[in-house]
Amino acid sequence: MTKDFLPTNTFFYPRTRLSPYFEGTQAAGAKAYSVYNHMYLPSWYRNTDEEYWALTKDVVIWDVAVERQVQIKGPDAFKFTNYITTKDLNKCKVNQCKYTLLCDGSGGIINDPVLSRLDDNLFWLSISDSDVLLWAKGLAHNSKWNVELSEPDVAPMQVQGPKSKALMISIFGPKVESLPYYHSMETTLSGMNMLVTRTGYTGEIGYEIYLRNAKKDGIKLWNTMLEAGK
């Protein structure tokens, strides 16, 4: 059984990253943060019961910039990504997403990212909590694969709940309605560039917005989504 601990204050340490949406989560009343992928993750706001019912009956937005992206591109990006993941990516088309595993040589799970295929030889891994970029660079170093590994300036935001589809259609138009489960589309909003995916881990219908140029546009997107959801 997990032991309950008394809540404590959070001290924001400069060696741990702030999300591009951090100021927005502060303004929204975030009461606690945890550290995930070396970045602060808002854990709860005013009332956890209210947040649960908002998710299951309405629509919520979440700062999940902690799902940091590992970008794999280059002539051998497909071969390399197909090697390090457990999915057969021959069955993954461009603009399709896959939930997959990264394993060590003994089959132990290193990470369980959601993979997005943006082009024939361009992939993003939206990772859970471990240093996948360093691990992948180690595999690629002095190897047979011609790949470039990096972390793009991208920050995911989740839009989840039974009313998420209506909200997304009101913002992005009817093209969102036809987006299949675990597929993606590139789009723009008020000069902001982003990848929208029909993904999420809530058990409710939902989407994720992968904002490009997130350091510049993070608060702009956050405020845009809040205003649209009123």
Question: Predicted regions span which residues?
Answer:
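Acidic, proline/glycine-enriched N-terminal capping motif
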Residues: 1-102, 108
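Residue-level marker for the onset of beta-strands and adjacent loop->beta junctions
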Residues: 68, 98, 111-112, 145, ...
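Acidic active-site catalytic centers that drive phospho-/nucleotidyl reactions
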Residues: 63, 112, 208
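Short amphipathic beta-strand starts and helix->beta connectors
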Residues: 48-57, 102-112, 141-144, 188-196
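Conserved, structured C-terminal
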Residues: 1-37, 41-43, 116-230
